[in-house]
Curated annotation (Swiss-Prot):
Belongs to the tRNA-modifying YgfZ family. It is found in: Cytoplasm. Coiled coil: none annotated. Folate-binding protein involved in regulating the level of ATP-DnaA and in the modification of some tRNAs. It is probably a key factor in regulatory networks that act via tRNA modification, such as initiation of chromosomal replication. This is tRNA-modifying protein YgfZ.
Protein backbone atom coordinates (compact mmCIF):
# COMPACT_ATOMS: atom_id res chain seq x y z
CA UNK A 1 0.00 0.00 0.00
CA UNK A 2 1.58 3.25 -1.11
CA UNK A 3 -0.61 5.33 1.21
CA UNK A 4 1.44 5.89 4.37
CA UNK A 5 -0.22 4.83 7.64
CA UNK A 6 -0.71 7.58 10.21
CA UNK A 7 1.52 7.49 13.30
CA UNK A 8 0.01 5.69 16.31
CA UNK A 9 -1.59 7.42 19.27
CA UNK A 10 -2.98 5.66 22.33
CA UNK A 11 -6.58 4.65 21.44
CA UNK A 12 -9.60 6.19 23.20
CA UNK A 13 -12.95 4.63 24.18
CA UNK A 14 -15.84 5.62 21.89
CA UNK A 15 -17.60 7.79 24.48
CA UNK A 16 -14.63 10.15 24.67
CA UNK A 17 -13.29 9.87 21.14
CA UNK A 18 -12.70 13.18 19.34
CA UNK A 19 -13.19 13.25 15.57
CA UNK A 20 -10.57 10.78 14.31
CA UNK A 21 -9.36 9.65 10.90
CA UNK A 22 -7.61 6.28 10.94
CA UNK A 23 -5.52 4.26 8.51
CA UNK A 24 -6.62 0.63 8.77
CA UNK A 25 -3.28 -0.93 7.85
CA UNK A 26 -3.86 -4.04 10.02
CA UNK A 27 -6.92 -4.82 7.89
CA UNK A 28 -6.80 -5.86 4.25
CA UNK A 29 -9.14 -6.00 1.26
CA UNK A 30 -9.83 -8.90 -1.10
CA UNK A 31 -12.25 -9.40 -3.98
CA UNK A 32 -14.02 -12.03 -6.03
CA UNK A 33 -15.14 -11.18 -9.56
CA UNK A 34 -16.60 -13.13 -12.45
CA UNK A 35 -19.89 -14.70 -13.52
CA UNK A 36 -19.97 -17.29 -10.71
CA UNK A 37 -18.99 -14.94 -7.85
CA UNK A 38 -22.27 -15.08 -5.95
CA UNK A 39 -22.73 -18.82 -6.36
CA UNK A 40 -19.14 -19.46 -5.32
CA UNK A 41 -19.28 -17.32 -2.18
CA UNK A 42 -22.67 -18.83 -1.29
CA UNK A 43 -20.93 -22.22 -1.07
CA UNK A 44 -18.07 -20.90 1.06
CA UNK A 45 -19.36 -18.53 3.75
CA UNK A 46 -21.89 -18.71 6.59
CA UNK A 47 -24.04 -15.78 5.43
CA UNK A 48 -26.71 -15.92 2.73
CA UNK A 49 -24.96 -13.77 0.12
CA UNK A 50 -27.73 -14.33 -2.43
CA UNK A 51 -29.99 -12.21 -0.21
CA UNK A 52 -27.45 -9.39 0.18
CA UNK A 53 -28.37 -6.10 -1.46
CA UNK A 54 -26.04 -3.33 -2.66
CA UNK A 55 -27.02 -1.43 0.51
CA UNK A 56 -25.77 -4.07 2.95
CA UNK A 57 -22.52 -5.23 4.47
CA UNK A 58 -22.24 -8.06 6.95
CA UNK A 59 -19.77 -10.08 8.95
CA UNK A 60 -19.61 -13.65 7.64
CA UNK A 61 -17.31 -16.55 8.48
CA UNK A 62 -15.26 -18.63 6.07
CA UNK A 63 -14.84 -22.06 7.69
CA UNK A 64 -12.96 -25.30 7.17
CA UNK A 65 -14.79 -28.63 6.79
CA UNK A 66 -14.99 -28.95 10.59
CA UNK A 67 -16.73 -25.59 10.88
CA UNK A 68 -13.67 -23.80 12.31
CA UNK A 69 -13.16 -20.28 10.96
CA UNK A 70 -10.21 -19.50 8.75
CA UNK A 71 -11.30 -15.89 9.11
CA UNK A 72 -14.30 -13.67 9.36
CA UNK A 73 -15.04 -11.32 6.48
CA UNK A 74 -16.75 -7.94 6.40
CA UNK A 75 -18.51 -8.59 3.11
CA UNK A 76 -20.19 -6.22 0.62
CA UNK A 77 -21.10 -6.18 -3.08
CA UNK A 78 -18.37 -4.65 -5.23
CA UNK A 79 -18.57 -4.26 -9.01
CA UNK A 80 -19.92 -7.51 -10.45
CA UNK A 81 -18.77 -9.49 -7.43
CA UNK A 82 -17.94 -9.03 -3.76
CA UNK A 83 -15.23 -7.46 -1.67
CA UNK A 84 -14.38 -8.17 1.94
CA UNK A 85 -12.22 -6.78 4.69
CA UNK A 86 -10.34 -9.06 7.08
CA UNK A 87 -7.26 -8.91 9.27
CA UNK A 88 -4.13 -8.57 7.15
CA UNK A 89 -2.43 -11.36 9.12
CA UNK A 90 -4.95 -13.95 7.83
CA UNK A 91 -5.65 -12.72 4.31
CA UNK A 92 -3.04 -14.76 2.45
CA UNK A 93 -3.97 -18.06 4.12
CA UNK A 94 -7.71 -17.34 3.85
CA UNK A 95 -7.43 -16.63 0.12
CA UNK A 96 -5.42 -19.83 -0.39
CA UNK A 97 -8.27 -21.82 1.20
CA UNK A 98 -10.96 -19.91 -0.70
CA UNK A 99 -9.25 -20.57 -4.05
CA UNK A 100 -9.08 -24.35 -3.56
CA UNK A 101 -12.27 -25.04 -5.51
CA UNK A 102 -12.14 -22.00 -7.80
CA UNK A 103 -10.67 -23.90 -10.76
CA UNK A 104 -14.17 -25.23 -11.55
CA UNK A 105 -15.85 -21.81 -11.48
CA UNK A 106 -15.75 -18.59 -13.49
CA UNK A 107 -14.25 -16.49 -10.71
CA UNK A 108 -11.12 -14.49 -9.99
CA UNK A 109 -10.14 -14.21 -6.33
CA UNK A 110 -7.43 -11.71 -5.44
CA UNK A 111 -6.01 -9.46 -2.75
CA UNK A 112 -6.58 -5.75 -3.40
CA UNK A 113 -3.83 -3.44 -2.18
CA UNK A 114 -4.57 -0.70 -4.71
CA UNK A 115 -7.41 0.66 -2.63
CA UNK A 116 -6.94 2.28 0.76
CA UNK A 117 -8.91 1.48 3.93
CA UNK A 118 -9.70 4.39 6.24
CA UNK A 119 -11.91 4.74 9.30
CA UNK A 120 -13.71 7.85 10.53
CA UNK A 121 -15.17 7.90 14.04
CA UNK A 122 -15.64 10.10 17.05
CA UNK A 123 -17.30 13.42 17.73
CA UNK A 124 -19.51 14.56 14.83
CA UNK A 125 -18.02 12.08 12.38
CA UNK A 126 -21.13 12.29 10.18
CA UNK A 127 -21.02 16.09 10.00
CA UNK A 128 -17.34 16.03 9.01
CA UNK A 129 -17.97 13.56 6.16
CA UNK A 130 -21.16 15.32 5.01
CA UNK A 131 -18.94 18.19 3.85
CA UNK A 132 -17.01 15.81 1.59
CA UNK A 133 -19.48 13.23 0.21
CA UNK A 134 -22.90 13.92 -1.29
CA UNK A 135 -24.50 10.92 0.47
CA UNK A 136 -23.53 9.03 3.60
CA UNK A 137 -24.57 5.52 4.65
CA UNK A 138 -27.00 5.05 7.54
CA UNK A 139 -28.87 2.31 9.40
CA UNK A 140 -31.36 1.98 6.50
CA UNK A 141 -28.69 2.04 3.80
CA UNK A 142 -25.43 0.77 5.25
CA UNK A 143 -23.34 0.95 2.07
CA UNK A 144 -23.05 3.99 -0.21
CA UNK A 145 -20.89 4.22 -3.33
CA UNK A 146 -19.63 7.48 -4.81
CA UNK A 147 -17.05 7.48 -7.58
CA UNK A 148 -14.09 5.38 -6.50
CA UNK A 149 -15.29 5.31 -2.89
CA UNK A 150 -17.40 2.83 -0.92
CA UNK A 151 -18.56 3.94 2.53
CA UNK A 152 -19.70 1.39 5.14
CA UNK A 153 -21.77 2.47 8.16
CA UNK A 154 -21.40 0.98 11.66
CA UNK A 155 -23.71 1.62 14.58
CA UNK A 156 -21.54 0.26 17.40
CA UNK A 157 -19.97 1.20 19.71
CA UNK A 158 -20.94 4.65 18.32
CA UNK A 159 -21.61 5.78 14.75
CA UNK A 160 -18.52 5.31 12.57
CA UNK A 161 -17.61 4.85 8.94
CA UNK A 162 -15.21 2.59 7.06
CA UNK A 163 -14.05 4.04 3.74
CA UNK A 164 -12.70 1.93 0.87
CA UNK A 165 -11.22 4.25 -1.72
CA UNK A 166 -8.38 5.04 -4.11
CA UNK A 167 -5.16 6.75 -3.11
CA UNK A 168 -6.13 10.13 -4.59
CA UNK A 169 -9.38 10.26 -2.60
CA UNK A 170 -7.58 9.07 0.54
CA UNK A 171 -5.11 11.94 0.17
CA UNK A 172 -7.94 14.41 -0.43
CA UNK A 173 -9.79 13.15 2.66
CA UNK A 174 -6.66 13.44 4.77
CA UNK A 175 -6.03 17.00 3.57
CA UNK A 176 -9.63 18.05 4.27
CA UNK A 177 -9.85 16.46 7.72
CA UNK A 178 -6.30 17.03 8.92
CA UNK A 179 -7.14 20.34 10.58
CA UNK A 180 -10.16 19.19 12.59
CA UNK A 181 -9.54 15.46 13.08
CA UNK A 182 -6.97 13.55 15.07
CA UNK A 183 -5.03 11.07 12.96
CA UNK A 184 -4.46 7.56 14.27
CA UNK A 185 -3.65 4.06 13.05
CA UNK A 186 -5.41 0.68 13.12
CA UNK A 187 -5.21 0.33 16.90
CA UNK A 188 -8.00 2.87 17.36
CA UNK A 189 -10.31 0.98 14.98
CA UNK A 190 -9.34 -2.25 16.75
CA UNK A 191 -10.32 -0.71 20.10
CA UNK A 192 -13.73 0.25 18.65
CA UNK A 193 -14.25 -3.26 17.22
CA UNK A 194 -13.43 -4.77 20.62
CA UNK A 195 -15.91 -2.39 22.28
CA UNK A 196 -18.55 -3.31 19.65
CA UNK A 197 -18.02 -7.03 20.23
CA UNK A 198 -16.96 -7.69 16.63
CA UNK A 199 -14.68 -10.75 16.73
CA UNK A 200 -11.10 -10.14 15.60
CA UNK A 201 -9.53 -13.20 13.96
CA UNK A 202 -5.78 -12.86 13.53
CA UNK A 203 -3.41 -15.58 12.31
CA UNK A 204 -2.89 -17.01 15.83
CA UNK A 205 -6.60 -17.89 16.07
CA UNK A 206 -7.29 -18.93 12.48
CA UNK A 207 -8.79 -22.44 12.30
CA UNK A 208 -9.55 -22.51 16.04
CA UNK A 209 -13.20 -21.58 16.56
CA UNK A 210 -16.64 -22.27 15.17
CA UNK A 211 -18.48 -19.01 14.33
CA UNK A 212 -20.86 -19.22 17.32
CA UNK A 213 -17.93 -19.27 19.75
CA UNK A 214 -17.30 -15.68 18.61
CA UNK A 215 -20.99 -14.55 18.74
CA UNK A 216 -21.37 -14.43 14.96
CA UNK A 217 -24.97 -15.67 15.20
CA UNK A 218 -25.84 -12.60 17.34
CA UNK A 219 -24.28 -10.34 14.70
CA UNK A 220 -26.40 -11.72 11.85
CA UNK A 221 -23.45 -13.49 10.25
CA UNK A 222 -24.89 -17.01 10.00
CA UNK A 223 -27.85 -18.13 7.90
CA UNK A 224 -29.41 -21.40 9.08
CA UNK A 225 -31.75 -21.48 6.07
CA UNK A 226 -29.35 -21.35 3.12
CA UNK A 227 -27.98 -24.24 1.06
CA UNK A 228 -24.77 -26.03 1.91
CA UNK A 229 -21.39 -24.38 2.41
CA UNK A 230 -18.06 -25.61 3.72
CA UNK A 231 -18.38 -26.46 7.42
CA UNK A 232 -22.16 -26.07 7.48
CA UNK A 233 -22.86 -29.40 9.17
CA UNK A 234 -20.76 -28.50 12.22
CA UNK A 235 -22.13 -24.95 12.40
CA UNK A 236 -25.72 -26.27 12.25
CA UNK A 237 -25.01 -28.96 14.84
CA UNK A 238 -23.70 -26.32 17.24
CA UNK A 239 -27.04 -24.53 17.01
CA UNK A 240 -29.56 -27.35 16.86
CA UNK A 241 -27.83 -29.74 19.27
CA UNK A 242 -26.55 -27.08 21.63
CA UNK A 243 -22.99 -28.20 20.95
CA UNK A 244 -21.49 -24.73 21.32
CA UNK A 245 -20.38 -24.01 24.89
CA UNK A 246 -18.37 -20.88 24.17
CA UNK A 247 -18.97 -17.19 23.62
CA UNK A 248 -17.06 -13.98 22.97
CA UNK A 249 -16.64 -11.75 26.02
CA UNK A 250 -15.40 -8.22 26.60
CA UNK A 251 -13.17 -7.69 29.63
CA UNK A 252 -11.82 -4.40 30.95
CA UNK A 253 -9.54 -3.40 33.80
CA UNK A 254 -5.81 -3.19 34.23
CA UNK A 255 -2.86 -5.33 33.30
CA UNK A 256 0.88 -4.80 33.45
CA UNK A 257 1.18 -6.15 29.90
CA UNK A 258 -1.16 -6.73 26.97
CA UNK A 259 -2.06 -10.38 26.40
CA UNK A 260 -1.43 -11.57 22.85
CA UNK A 261 -3.83 -13.24 20.44
CA UNK A 262 -4.00 -16.97 21.25
CA UNK A 263 -2.94 -16.54 24.88
CA UNK A 264 -5.09 -17.72 27.79
CA UNK A 265 -6.16 -15.72 30.85
CA UNK A 266 -6.70 -16.74 34.48
CA UNK A 267 -10.03 -16.91 36.32
CA UNK A 268 -10.21 -16.41 40.10
CA UNK A 269 -11.56 -19.53 41.86
CA UNK A 270 -11.66 -18.86 45.61
CA UNK A 271 -8.03 -18.25 46.60
CA UNK A 272 -6.66 -19.76 43.41
CA UNK A 273 -6.44 -18.90 39.72
CA UNK A 274 -7.35 -21.24 36.88
CA UNK A 275 -6.41 -20.83 33.23
CA UNK A 276 -9.31 -20.07 30.96
CA UNK A 277 -10.24 -18.76 27.52
CA UNK A 278 -8.39 -17.64 24.42
CA UNK A 279 -7.58 -13.99 23.77
CA UNK A 280 -8.57 -12.69 20.32
CA UNK A 281 -7.37 -9.09 20.75
CA UNK A 282 -6.37 -6.57 23.41
CA UNK A 283 -5.69 -2.84 23.49
CA UNK A 284 -4.49 -0.37 26.11
CA UNK A 285 -6.50 2.87 26.06
CA UNK A 286 -5.13 6.35 26.72
CA UNK A 287 -6.70 6.41 30.20
CA UNK A 288 -4.64 3.33 31.11
CA UNK A 289 -7.55 0.89 30.90
CA UNK A 290 -6.92 -2.43 29.16
CA UNK A 291 -9.74 -3.95 27.08
CA UNK A 292 -9.57 -7.61 26.09
CA UNK A 293 -11.67 -9.63 23.65
CA UNK A 294 -11.67 -13.27 24.71
CA UNK A 295 -13.48 -16.51 23.86
CA UNK A 296 -14.51 -18.37 27.03
CA UNK A 297 -17.24 -20.68 28.31
CA UNK A 298 -20.64 -19.12 27.69
CA UNK A 299 -21.82 -19.66 31.28
CA UNK A 300 -19.33 -17.37 33.07
CA UNK A 301 -20.70 -15.64 36.17
CA UNK A 302 -21.08 -11.90 35.45
CA UNK A 303 -19.03 -10.92 38.53
CA UNK A 304 -16.09 -13.22 37.67
CA UNK A 305 -12.60 -11.81 38.14
CA UNK A 306 -9.84 -12.44 35.60
CA UNK A 307 -6.22 -11.49 35.10
CA UNK A 308 -3.47 -11.72 32.53
CA UNK A 309 -1.40 -14.74 33.54
CA UNK A 310 0.47 -14.19 36.86
CA UNK A 311 -0.43 -10.48 36.85
CA UNK A 312 -1.17 -8.40 39.96
CA UNK A 313 -4.04 -6.51 38.28
CA UNK A 314 -7.55 -7.71 37.43
CA UNK A 315 -10.09 -7.60 34.60
CA UNK A 316 -13.88 -7.82 34.77
CA UNK A 317 -16.70 -8.56 32.32
CA UNK A 318 -18.22 -5.58 30.50
CA UNK A 319 -21.57 -5.69 28.66
CA UNK A 320 -21.65 -6.06 24.87
CA UNK A 321 -24.02 -3.93 22.75
CA UNK A 322 -26.02 -6.99 21.61
CA UNK A 323 -27.81 -9.95 23.18
CA UNK A 324 -26.83 -13.62 22.92
CA UNK A 325 -30.37 -14.77 23.71
CA UNK A 326 -31.73 -16.78 20.78
Amino acid sequence: MAFTPFPPRQPTASARLPLTLMTLDDWALATITGADSEKYMQGQVTADVSQMTEDQHLLAAHCDAKGKMWSNLRLFRDGDGFAWIERRSVRESQLTELKKYAVFSKVTIAPDDERVLLGVAGFQARAALANIFSELPSKEKQVVKEGATTLLWFEHPAERFLIVTDEATANMLTDKLRGEAELNNSQQWLALNIEAGFPVIDAANSGQFIPQATNLQALGGISFKKGCYTGQEMVARAKFRGANKRALWLLAGSASRLPEAGEDLELKMGENWRRTGTVLAAVKLEDGQVVVQVVMNNDMEPDSIFRVRDDANTLRIEPLPYSLEE
